Amino acid sequence: MKQVNLLLMSAAMTLAACGGTKDAGQAGVPLIERSNIKIEGKRMTPEALWAMGRIGGVAVSPDEKQIAYTVAYYSVPENKSNREVFVMNTDGTGNQQITRTPWQENEVNWIKGGTKLAFLSNESGSSQLWEMNPDGSGRKQLTQYDGDIEGYSFSPDGKKLLFIAQVKTKPSTADKYPDLPKATGIIVTDLMYKHWDEWVTGAPHPFVADFDGNSISNIKDILEGKPYESPMRPWGGIEQLAWSPAGDKVAYTCRKKTGLAYAISTNSDIYIYDLATKKTDNITEENKGYDTNPQYSPDGKYIAWQSMERDGYEADLNRLFIMNLETGEKRFVSKEFESNVDGFLWNKDSKSIYFIGVWHGETQIYNVDLAANDKITQLTDGMYDYASLALAGDKVIALRHSMSMGDEI
């Protein structure tokens, strides 16, 4: 694997050997690990594709010297996957697998000044938040929430936890007919009753809780009593929620509709919830298409998000917008690009934004200079597609794939 200019390293493609591990799998529980498949005659088969690990989210340590990421391995006979955590230096050296368990470690993030790694795991029987040392030792469960935690984000000061969990929004068949406890049928009276292969029985809600370093308390459902989704199905995750730099507000994405109106509309909005006053403001009410994925600028003066203009048009142009939080002025900052913005990240100085966009069949990384009339500069080139952005000093960390290789860092 060779280094390229923008990337700091090229992570081993998960068919190659990795470093030492911690916390071996539990006895009696199948452990899905890296496959040792051999490709004969240079033929790419379905089995070879499933043998490749899939790199997950990348998190940079606060001192910007290390990267934590996950890799998912697959078992065709078991029809399951398992995700493990790896840590490496930002120059690509010292790559080590730090977990080796059947418990699906995922959504890894650095916490407590970089002394711990937070992650989700189903080791306790449900998806809960855990922490461990950066070498994989000292696993400790942080939450005992009654249900699965599907995503999370700590406030900038680390004293509060924002997390996603399902809430029940409609009665089940068993609720309606308690004398039929074994009934498995679904009673459908309205849309949406299904997303792809998942029946809709509830909605994901954002919760905020106090965190003392060991456990959470004072849990508050931001959408308590409401039938709405935040993040939105079927693909939304923690990227649709954001802390303000001061940790006093949460921005969230929501389409506040139900039934048929929900099913035929793409009119979602960005809402800002004030933790102190419990007041919610809709900052994109005038726009009728998708508004998603809010991000505050590091200096707290602006908020950016992705926006589509027209309601009901899922293939509309995905634009990058910013709003001045003091004046309320909004600006379409990717107008010069004339294509979709697929993801973005504020620069540390709050004066520019990195984004990923498709142009002529390639997904490249760009920078829009907000102080220079939104001038857009293309930073990468070649027959590749980039995904996921993070910053480490003056470097951009990204995932990259092509027709001949899977995602690498």
Regions found by a protein language model. Give the residues of each.
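C-terminal motif of bacterial Sec signal peptides marking the signal peptidase cleavage site
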Residues: 15-17
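Hydrophobic beta-strand positions that form the internal "hydrophobic ladder"
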Residues: 64-67, 114-118, 161-162, 247-250, ...
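Predominantly five- to eight-bladed beta-propeller fold
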Residues: 25-32, 83, 166-225, 253-256, ...
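Multi-bladed beta-propeller domains
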Residues: 31-54, 80, 88-104, 121, ...
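Short glycine/acidic-enriched loop and turn motifs that connect beta-strands
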Residues: 73-77, 123-126, 168-171, 257-260, ...
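Beta-strand-rich domains and repeat architectures in extracellular enzymes and scaffolds
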Residues: 47-83
